[in-house]
Amino acid sequence: MYKTKGGFQLTLQTLSLVVGFMAWSIIAPLMPFIKQDVNVTEGQISIILAIPVILGSVLRVPFGYLTNIVGAKWVFFTSFIVLLFPIFFLSQAQTPGMLMASGFFLGVGGAIFSVGVTSVPKYFPKEKVGLANGIYGMGNIGTAVSSFLAPPIAGIIGWQTTVRSYLIIIALFALIMFIFGDTQERKIKVPLMAQMKTLSKNYKLYYLSYWYFITFGAFVAFGIFLPNYLVNHFGIDKVDAGIRSGVFIALATFLRPIGGILGDKFNAVKVLMIDFVVMIIGAIILGISDHIALFTVGCLTISICAGIGNGLIFKLVPSYFLNEAGSANGIVSMMGGLGGFFPPLVITYVANLTGSSHLAFIFLAVFGCIALFTMRHLYQKEYGSLKNG
């Protein structure tokens, strides 16, 4: 695979996604350092952390569409050039407003996810698309890279200099993409409104968006809330909590290609149903766990299923939407990003209301059960009885 043009572009775009996600997630791990120099309230911090997540999700729709129009090379290149400005602005931030403005445009780093999932399938036969998109999705590990490396580096050279060091990485990848990006990528120029009209009538888009809202939403949400949750509810050391959270992120990320491989070899919808059954069991375990050991089992179960599920879903998207792949990828990935924004808020609200977060995890199980019904409906419409395929 890697001896081909497609293999080279897959490698280039995956590394670009790593860098984009590093920039997208830079504020959160550095916030303990930033708030020592910038006077911010807890409420302002929550807004500052949320802004990149929201914009990084919403921008995925136009980015996916633009990829089909001009090609991944120019969307990646332009995104990296744009990212230089908020990164530099962040390194100079002295007020909450400057942090918010920086975070707003850092969302570009998260939005580039839809570029690769739109471009990469063009280079591979249908039976390899799941694996290819799964490998590309491993670029999500950029979030973990910032989480693991940015704090210790900031402890040595300061958070401002740490942020400015990202300028070198981003500029380097802008240059690499300019030189090695594929100018011959196949373009699909279907008018946006025509695509949206077609997509709005296709129930599969709504199902896939809902499923990804759960799987990728769980991936993002657990990465956000786990460190504080482990410290507050189980009294775990902050460093240990960070390591455990990093394991969750890494496990889900590296299992994403496995989901793609399974989707290539077997019926992806059937495998996804099995995946969600196991995820529901994991959510129930979290909903009844009061001990760290049982909670860890539940978290690892969710991580495994989220990673495999992410890969399976992006095996299905290009299969169902050929001419509208860019917009469909953008919409589905947008919903996944938004899925990571709401769960931490729900967990906090439920904990404040009931004194326990158990009910919030049961909500995840309920959402999973609803997803199973939609999967059964799609499978029966597309393939007939579940006994077939």
From Swiss-Prot:
Cell compartments where the protein resides: Cell membrane
Induction comment: Positively regulated by the two-component system NreB/NreC.
UniProt cross-references to SUPFAM superfamilies, sorted A to Z: MFS general substrate transporter
One biological process term in Gene Ontology: nitrate assimilation
Transmembrane segment boundaries: 14-34, 45-65, 69-89, 97-117, 139-159, 161-181, 211-231, 246-266, 268-288, 294-314, 331-351, 353-373
GO MF terms, alphabetically ordered: nitrate transmembrane transporter activity
GO CC field: plasma membrane
Entry membrane topology: Multi-pass membrane protein
Keyword entries, A-Z: Cell membrane, Membrane, Nitrate assimilation, Transmembrane, Transmembrane helix, Transport
Record-linked PROSITE patterns: MFS (PS50850)
InterPro entries in the record: MFS, MFS_dom, MFS_trans_sf, NO3_transporter
Entry keyword Transmembrane helix: yes
Free-text function comment from the UniProt entry: Probably required for nitrate uptake under anoxic conditions. Also possibly involved in excretion of nitrite produced by the dissimilatory reduction of nitrate.
PANTHER family: HIGH-AFFINITY NITRATE TRANSPORTER 2.3 (PTHR23515)
Protein name: Probable nitrate transporter NarT
